Amino acid sequence: MAVARSLRSGESGPRTGSEIRTAFLTFFAERAHQVIPSASLVPEDPTVLLTIAGMLPFKPVFMGQAERPAPRATSSQKCIRTNDIENVGRTARHHTFFEMLGNFSFGDYFKQQAIEWAWELSTEVFGLNPKNLVVSVFREDDEAEAIWRDVVGVNPKRIIRMDEADNFWASGPTGPCGPCSEIYYDFKPDLGNDDIDLEDDGRFVEFYNLVFMQYNRDGEGNLTPLANRNIDTGMGLERMAQILQGVPNNYETDIIYPLIETAAGLAGLDYQKLDDKGKTSFKVIGDHCRAITHLICDGVTASNLGRGYIMRRLLRRVVRHGRLVGIEKPFLQAMGEAAIALMVEAYPQLEERRKLILAELNREEARFLETLERGEKVLADVLVANPQMISGGQAFELYDTYGFPLELTQEIAEEHGLTVDLQGFEQAMDQQRQRAKAAAVSIDLTLQGAIEQMAAELEATRFKGYQVLEQPCCVLALVVNGESAERASAGDNVQIVLDTTPFYGESGGQVGDHGVLSGEGSGGNGVIVAVDDVSRHRNVFVHFGRIERGTLALGDLVNAQVDRACRRRAQANHTATHLLQAALKQVVDSGIGQAGSLVDFDRLRFDFHCSRAVTAKELEQIEALINGWIMESHDLIVEEMSIQEAKAAGAVAMFGEKYADVVRVVDVPGVSMELCGGTHVANTAEIGLFKIVAESSVAAGIRRIEAVAGPAVLAYLNERDVVVKELGDRFKAQPSEIIERVISLQEELKSSQKALTAARAELAVAKSAALATQAVAVGEYQLLVARLDGVEGAGLQNAAQGLLDQLGDATAVVLGGLPDPSDEGKVILVAAFGKQVIAQGQQAGKFIGSIAKRCGGGGGGRPNLAQAGGRDGAALDGALEAAKVELKQSLG
């Protein structure tokens, strides 16, 4: 193994990736830094799809929007970036997935301490020779240069000043910002200190970046010193591993190389003997497998939107590069197993979610292999017909009709020396967006903006709803018609913020409470507000409602009263949701994790990660378990404790969710224990009854169970009774006889359909027998193109095959028709080619697929017999005439 040879066995200090990570965190933990576990790749920041930097989880702290977790922190954060995806595998250090080691100061130590520790860590812990190190500073940062030169003792010739584009960090056009300083490793120090060019990545690699957040930039670009200065640093784990292990690139470190070896073994190749192109494919596989394994683990499933699209794109690139190196069979499960084994020590959750990860890899790989097979056939025809460029329309058709990603079309085109008309593709995509606009739903941005502004300016609402359902409160803010207001009158739809509230605000899947606000009001004649929703914005509770009577003004005192019946129903459904998750884990799979939920007053919905449908028998078992727990009358225990205590006690958390240091734990002893901020019954008996009403798929790898509990079960059963009674009346059968009656009718219908199909087939054969006389001679060949309506696809194929058998191997038969002559929206086309026609280079599948496009469709099949379909019956005669002309030209 190349990596094993490169590791400096016998030398002291960290060398492996695991040792480097541990050494970094230990170094800063010993210097009073709190070790923060890696956050999910799915960030809380809604403006970012994925966690792209080690500092991202701390961004709210740096921006002054959240409390600091500690004065000092350190972490090893998993990250994903895809902006340079085309460079992955082609350069020594580009990756999609990487780990960023970092140390952070939130208003504590600053520039000199950060620089001194960075140097100490690099030279004394990691053992890097100072002669191999070069540092960069911002061109105007005299302070940093002086520290490097006078305090640390770096040779002035190895301190390089850089421009703002390289060495000045900013969170945006305005806000916190500051200069950076970077440490580079010099692989060729013998070249001296003259004309150092840090852009020469063959000689230098940046491995440690120090950001000094010391300024605030206003709208005019002016910089003013921050009252609390911060430190944000990042060291690339993969880059440090390359340096310490002495290998030519990051891919051949012990962090990634085992995955490359696994893939090479599956391909039956020796990686070290491959040319650059072959090695690139294995590097892509190794890199992307790390990324997709962690993405699935963090709850991302493949889709055509957002982070789901990123995961799908990475996974499909893995499959594509696997085929390029000769891996034809499905192999992602093997790669997933290898990735989990490689990274599980640092990320134990990979083992916990192993089944989910492997199931998602298998499913998406199988789906893409089907897409790839279809798309590659079509793309092959496009490549032959377009020797220089693939048009935007063709690329869009591949994307829209066959699910073939644009990036993949570009890659394959590049391999053949072609380009893709990207502008044309975007035009086609834009036309599709315009067509979809009719279905778009707009959001009241004016109202949303007013609420967000209001929430940002107010202190957190004191929530009393766990203890009481009625509470005197003071009106702090009002929004009327999307604008902040001082008063509102009867008939106004309003949004209200109170200093204190018993109303539960929508969160954790549970809907907001309903109820009433009442008081004397500003007019003195009393005010009543009907509250029909409550939401949370930055821990401020916003009450949505309508003023039924009187006038409400800022500062008014009101009595807030929650609708007790609604609250009881929501509580029953929320506790039932916890029992449902516990039952799923017990009956279906202990590794099942929550993907989402809805807790409403009259129903509940639970989404969970699962690679298959829950069987009818399992649903029965789940129902029985839950109703058993309800009848056992378990008292619930609700406690607040530290997140560490909760996890140690076995409390279930929603994966990827970020929790405070102190959490609320809802415990149904011996049954379920979850972290939850929702409202619940005091005893399971209060739920009454539980009934599952549906189980379905909502996305790849995500299932949904819908259910009712309590009084809603009776309403559901009453509705079912009405349906059963109506069916009984229609079928003139007792309820117990309905199923038998339906089966009997189905058998009768099936028999009738079978007889009809047979009759149509006989009719097709009878009609086709007369068609043989219409065959025309084309040189040595026979050509028959005809229209035959009223025949389904199977009958049309039988007719074509019968004509071919009758006319001989030197015959081409093309038949087309409308299965239902009254419906021009469905066209069937069939081609049957004899052996001698096929020998001339004609293939029935390709030929009939191209002809079908004239009818707005497509299709294909075997070289000798193929079927296609279309949607435009009016174009059928023209398509058949085109088929006749093309075959005459090719066979004549």
Swiss-Prot record:
Belongs to the class-II aminoacyl-tRNA synthetase family. This is Alanine--tRNA ligase. Its EC number is 6.1.1.7. InterPro entries: aa-tRNA-synth_II/BPL/LPL (IPR045864), Ala-tRNA-lgiase_IIc (IPR002318), Ala-tRNA-ligase_IIc_anticod-bd (IPR018162), Ala-tRNA-synth_IIc_core (IPR018165), Ala-tRNA-synth_IIc_N (IPR018164), Ala-tRNA_ligase (IPR050058), Ala_tRNA_ligase_euk/bac (IPR023033), DHHA1_dom (IPR003156). The gene is alaS. The keyword Ligase applies. It comes from Prochlorococcus marinus (strain MIT 9303). Consists of three domains; the N-terminal catalytic domain, the editing domain and the C-terminal C-Ala domain. The editing domain removes incorrectly charged amino acids, while the C-Ala domain, along with tRNA(Ala), serves as a bridge to cooperatively bring together the editing and aminoacylation centers thus stimulating deacylation of misacylated tRNAs. Its cofactor is Zn(2+). The keyword Nucleotide-binding applies.
